[in-house]
């Protein structure tokens, strides 16, 4: 294809090149506009050969591409092919002649189309041959496909996208091959280009190319239509030699040089304009690469080197500009792809519908292949390969789900469908329990497959771990063991470590390995003669290879630092039904890395595991590998496993020493939580040196429970507090509405608040326990929460008219009535309203109320008080108790008094307050049952005045009611404003609301807790004008104080504790009656 250097008027005769001597044959030339230079259109010369081989006919210049029918007229066949003339210092462009297909073709030669034409490889053309004649305009040059054209593809390893310039070492800003493609790009694979290039080189005398300064600012025929159809990105390309191979033309000097960027309409760096790409320039899809390559990559890059959205989202051209002739190459589906290349997207071919992957049977090197647009007709003939190689990629694993699986049902399974290894199972069920009697050591160095065994896992106390099954010893069963995870997520088989069977003379336990879901499981027999126990001296830990780790799906998000494991043991116990009971237990975390065991901190124990959301508590953490710069981080994770709250505990450095760290628990980020919140904390010595996370619980300080109409009290969960208030719903067939828990004419307040102030200094909750003898059972439900608010109690004087109203949230009706002996109203028996739980009390340094014993008798039975203040609590001081008993009409109730036990300095001389109303016709008598001592608050202070007993009898006609004494004790400072040392005058009312309901069947099945709200102290309601709903316990206390002011009985605490119960003829009762 090259010619010798000729003079200005010498012709380029190719007869010498091909050894032909035929006479020139008339050729037809394609007409073109006069303003267009032929050099712009004739950059590649295609030789069509047909016998007889006489002479070289002409050189054809295919504008744009061979299949585009852009010429509608042919030139006169009276011109022969003229050689290129060498013009120095001129910009005239030589003309090329177009041969017509009408004449015989004496010789055909395959054309070699490589890439855009280099300005250094062009020959000068003769510009003086301009006699063009139009002949046969309706005949087009491309009536039939040119079977002689070779389209040689690039091979996948031709160049790197980031290093190589254009494929033929072009300095152009664009090449036919997109820069978005990498060396693994799926490209056109054809026949071996080496043999073709060698064959072509043997036919031609390759000479030194000369640079043509010729150029034209204008375009070739069809340029504007080309721009309109295919966009400007394909119209401009620098000149490049058609004789250069992609393999041979890249030199050391230019293969790393970056190509200058140019816009779609920029001119080339050649001084004389830009030569058109012509037949080597073809169209795939009309999309542009990030570097404006006219020919983007035919397939997506497995490495995801696409850098611009326009390369992926450019419109796909149809085949309207293509000839209907078939393509002279074939497509194939299979290409070579690196087997371990990672694919960074699921289906990039799906977003590249216009990219065709064209290949041949033999894989060869690259040559610019013809771009093709896909239409419906061509798509079936040349199938579109979307992602046929997707299966050969190693897909990136999807993120591991952090959601915990639901167990579903009881751990009883069929033998044919045993639970998977990641299924959560309990440690005990029924009478069977699986337990680890001896835990393994916290460190065991795992071994690789390529090294020798490091022995079995050992125990911290020496020997090996011991596992025992309790509750079953009928026949031997297999104990399954595998290596599980030890992170914050639910237990599952570990991805990096497997159990390894240890054998040898020193191994006493038989075992065998099985594979369950690609996890090694060691089966160890549990024998009845060994008491269903086994020493695990046959199990080691095997570390998988890193490649195996990477291949395991779902574990790449953890990383290779997950070196802690647990030994998981599982048994399947046969059941009489033919099924099996599956139990599972996991050991403590075991560190498998030697380096991690030496560097990572380890928390062995900590002093407290819960505190209020306000924080501030001191916690002592004990462990190993603690450093002076160690930090303790509290965090809370969401359902996805990602932390959404972190806080650092304040370490008290002066108290830390060695393996002990003392810190202050940080407050929780949401102090308004209404239930306990579980968080985690860990100790870290650096960015990646963290200990295992430990659990910690924040408890709420304020929980206000309003009225809930459809909530049963028995379904309300208890709070995680040291003491819980316990009450019982009375058995009733019909529920009482909450909004009418008190009937206005039949309600009464059971007075508990004395006329003297009391300070409360503990933070425990009260206990309330009731027993329903008719139901014959005892229930403990719903604790009373504690309010984090101070309250002040002002004692009422006998003649004072000051009232403090403590409002309750659950009553819409009247809450109390004045208990005046002179009142003419008749009051029904007072029954305790169990649905009204204790009001929220003060948690800021408050003392818990002691249990409120209550006995409700629905049948003739002897009742006794059930609630006792626990004496084994950490904070012994409690508030006082109230013993109360009532009965319904026609029943006999025996109530026992509650004597308050003085547990500090002697404070007050108390007298029992006895009260036992009954219905008309009912006979009640006090029973001298054994009194239950309840500890009271030993608050230091001067003795408070004695509380005299006040027997009260319901003024109903024909009734004989005897009092049931209730003793109260208050030890505190007697002052108008009750104060305590270190409390600053904070106090709470020790009043409990009791409700009188005539019919036990009218009790509601569920109730709501009572929230006590602080009342302004300057409010003094007028007793004569307020309604029943505004009467509070203080009003009743004033009435009690007036009654008690008339009683002058004085007894000591010892007398109260040892004195017999007052009977119907007791002097106390008589004095009370006389006072009434």
Curated annotation (Swiss-Prot):
Protein name: Nuclear factor of activated T-cells, cytoplasmic 3
Naturally occurring in which organism (per UniProt): Rattus norvegicus (Rat)
Chain span(s) of sequence motif Nuclear export signal: 1032-1041
Comp. bias (Polar residues): 237-254, 362-371, 724-734, 888-911, 970-981
Record motif Nuclear localization signal, residues: 274-276, 687-689
Domain RHD: 416-597
Record note on modification: Phosphorylated by NFATC-kinase; dephosphorylated by calcineurin. Ubiquitinated by STUB1/CHIP, leading to proteasomal degradation.
CDD domains: IPT_NFAT, RHD-n_NFAT
Stored SMART domains: IPT (SM00429)
Calcineurin-binding: region residues: 110-115
Localization: Cytoplasm; Nucleus
GO biological process, one term: positive thymic T cell selection
PROSITE patterns, alphabetized: REL_2
Domain notes: Rel Similarity Domain (RSD) allows DNA-binding and cooperative interactions with AP1 factors.
Low complexity compositional bias, start-end: 257-271, 713-722, 917-939, 946-965
Ranges annotated as DNA-binding: 445-452
Molecular-function annotations in GO: chromatin binding; DNA binding; DNA-binding transcription activator activity, RNA polymerase II-specific; DNA-binding transcription factor activity; DNA-binding transcription factor activity, RNA polymerase II-specific; DNA-binding transcription repressor activity, RNA polymerase II-specific; RNA polymerase II cis-regulatory region sequence-specific DNA binding; sequence-specific DNA binding
Induction: Induced by lipopolysaccharides.
Annotated segments matching region Disordered: 206-307, 359-390, 700-744, 863-987, 1049-1076
Region (3 X SP repeats): 208-309
Alphabetic keyword roster: Acetylation, Cytoplasm, DNA-binding, Nucleus, Phosphoprotein, Repeat, Transcription, Transcription regulation, Ubl conjugation
Alphabetical list of Gene3D superfamilies matching this protein: Immunoglobulins, Rel homology domain (RHD), DNA-binding domain
Ubl conjugation listed as a keyword: yes
One Pfam assignment: RHD_dimer
């Amino acid at each position: 294809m090259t010619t010798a250097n000729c003079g200005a008027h010498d012709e380029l005769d190719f007869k010498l090149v091909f050894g032909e001597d035929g006479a020139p044959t008339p050729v037809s030339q394609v007409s073109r506009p006069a303003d267009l230079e032929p050099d712009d259109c004739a950059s590649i010369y295609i030789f069509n050969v047909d016998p007889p081989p006489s002479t070289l006919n002409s050189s054809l210049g295919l504008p744009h591409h061979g299949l585009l029918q852009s010429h509608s007229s042919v030139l006169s066949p009276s011109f022969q092919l003229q050689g290129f003339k060498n013009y120095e210092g001129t910009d005239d462009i030589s003309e090329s002649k177009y041969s017509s297909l009408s004449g015989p073709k004496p010789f055909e030669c395959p054309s070699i189309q490589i890439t855009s034409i280099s300005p250094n490889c062009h020959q000068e053309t003769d510009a003086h041959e301009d006699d063009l004649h139009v002949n046969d305009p309706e005949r087009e040059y491309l009536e039939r496909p040119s079977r002689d054209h070779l389209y040689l593809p690039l091979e996948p390893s031709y160049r790197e996208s980031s290093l190589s310039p254009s494929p033929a070492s072009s300095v152009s800003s664009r090449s036919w091959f997109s820069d978005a493609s990498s060396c693994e790009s799926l490209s056109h694979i054809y026949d071996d280009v080496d043999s073709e290039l060698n064959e072509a080189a043997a036919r031609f005398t390759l000479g030194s190319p000369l640079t043509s300064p010729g150029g034209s600012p204008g375009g070739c025929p069809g340029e504007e239509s080309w721009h309109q159809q295919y966009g400007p990105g394909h119209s401009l390309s620098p000149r490049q030699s058609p004789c250069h191979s992609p393999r041979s033309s890249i030199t050391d000097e230019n293969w790393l040089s970056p190509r200058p960027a140019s816009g779609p309409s920029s001119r080339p760096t050649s001084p004389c304009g830009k030569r058109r790409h012509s037949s080597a320039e073809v169209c795939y899809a009309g999309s542009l690469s990030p570097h404006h390559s006219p020919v983007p990559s035919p397939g997506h890059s497995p490495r995801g080197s696409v850098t611009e959205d326009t390369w992926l989202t450019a419109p796909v051209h149809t085949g309207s500009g293509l000839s209907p002739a078939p393509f002279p190459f074939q497509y194939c589906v299979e290409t070579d792809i690196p087997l371990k290349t990672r694919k960074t997207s699921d289906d990039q071919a799906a977003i590249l519908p216009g990219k065709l992957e064209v290949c041949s049977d033999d894989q060869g090197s690259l040559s610019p292949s013809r771009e093709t647009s896909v239409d419906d007709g061509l798509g079936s003939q040349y199938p579109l390969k979307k992602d046929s190689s997707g299966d050969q990629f190693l897909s990136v694993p999807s993120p591991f789900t952090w959601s915990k699986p639901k167990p579903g049902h009881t751990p009883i399974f069929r033998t044919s469908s045993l639970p998977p290894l990641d299924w959560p199972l309990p440690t005990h069920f029924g009478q069977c329990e699986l337990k680890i009697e001896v835990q393994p050591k916290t460190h065991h160095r795992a071994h690789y497959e390529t090294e020798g065994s490091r022995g079995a896992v050992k125990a911290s106390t020496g020997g090996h771990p011991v596992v025992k099954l309790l509750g079953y010893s009928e026949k031997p069963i297999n104990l399954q063991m595998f290596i599980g995870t030890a992170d914050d997520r639910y237990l599952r088989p570990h991805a990096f470590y497997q159990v390894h069977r240890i054998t040898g003379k020193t191994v006493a336990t038989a075992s065998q390995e099985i594979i369950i879901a690609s996890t090694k499981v060691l089966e160890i027999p549990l024998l009845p003669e060994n008491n269903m126990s086994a020493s695990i001296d046959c199990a080691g830990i095997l570390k998988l290879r890193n490649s195996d780790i990477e291949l395991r799906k779902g574990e790449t998000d953890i990383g290779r630092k997950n070196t802690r494991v647990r030994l998981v043991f599982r048994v399947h116990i046969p059941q009489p039904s033919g099924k099996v009971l599956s139990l599972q237990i996991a050991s403590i975390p075991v560190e498998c890395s030697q380096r991690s065991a030496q560097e990572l901190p380890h928390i062995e124990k900590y002093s407290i595991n819960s505190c209020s959301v306000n924080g501030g508590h001191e916690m002592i953490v004990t462990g190993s590998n603690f450093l002076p710069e160690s930090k303790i981080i509290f965090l809370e994770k969401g359902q996805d496993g990602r932390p959404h709250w972190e806080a650092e505990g304040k370490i008290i450095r002066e108290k830390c020493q060695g393996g002990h760290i003392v810190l202050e628990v940080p407050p929780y980020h949401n102090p308004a939580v209404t239930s306990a919140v579980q968080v985690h904390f860990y100790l870290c010595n650096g960015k990646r040196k963290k200990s295992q996370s430990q659990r910690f619980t924040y408890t709420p300080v304020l929980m206000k429970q309003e009225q809930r109409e459809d909530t049963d009290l028995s379904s309300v969960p208890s709070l995680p507090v040291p003491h819980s208030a316990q009450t019982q719903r009375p058995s009733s067939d019909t529920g009482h509405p909450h909004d009418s828990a008190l009937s206005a004419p039949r309600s009464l307040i059971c007075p508990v608040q004395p006329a003297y102030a009391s300070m409360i200094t503990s933070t425990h909750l009260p206990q309330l326990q009731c027993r329903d003898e008719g139901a014959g059972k005892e229930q403990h439900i719903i604790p009373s929460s504690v309010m984090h608010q101070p309250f002040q109690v002002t004692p009422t004087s006998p003649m004072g008219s000051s009232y403090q109203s403590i409002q309750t949230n659950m009553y819409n009706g009247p809450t109390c009535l004045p208990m005046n002996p002179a009142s003419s109203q008749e009051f029904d028996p007072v029954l305790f309203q169990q649905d009204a739980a204790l009001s929220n009390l003060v948690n800021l340094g408050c003392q818990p109320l002691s249990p409120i014993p209550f006995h409700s008798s629905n049948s003739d039975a002897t009742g006794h008080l059930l609630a006792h203040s626990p004496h084994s609590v950490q904070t012994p001081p409690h508030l006082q108790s109230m013993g109360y008993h009532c009965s319904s009409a026609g029943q006999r109730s025996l109530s026992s008094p509650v004597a308050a036990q003085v547990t500090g300095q002697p404070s007050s001389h108390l007298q029992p307050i006895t009260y036992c109303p009954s219905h008309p016709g009912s006979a009640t008598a006090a029973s001298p049952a054994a009194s239950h001592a309840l500890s009271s608050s030993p608050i230091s202070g001067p003795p408070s005045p004695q509380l005299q007993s006040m027997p009260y009898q319901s003024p109903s006609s024909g009734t004989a009611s005897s009092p049931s004494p209730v003793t109260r004790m208050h030890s505190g400072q007697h002052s108008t404003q009750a104060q305590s040392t270190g409390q600053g005058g904070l106090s709470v009312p020790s009043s409990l609301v009791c409700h009188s309901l005539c019919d036990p069947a009218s009790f509601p099945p569920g109730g709501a807790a009572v929230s006590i709200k602080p009342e302004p102290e300057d409010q003094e309601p007028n007793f004569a004008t307020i309604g029943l709903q505004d009467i509070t316990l203080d009003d009743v206390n004033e009435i009690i104080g007036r009654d008690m002011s008339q009683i002058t009985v004085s007894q000591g605490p010892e007398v109260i504790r040892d004195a017999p119960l007052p009977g119907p003829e007791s002097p106390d009762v008589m004095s009370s009656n006389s006072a009434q």
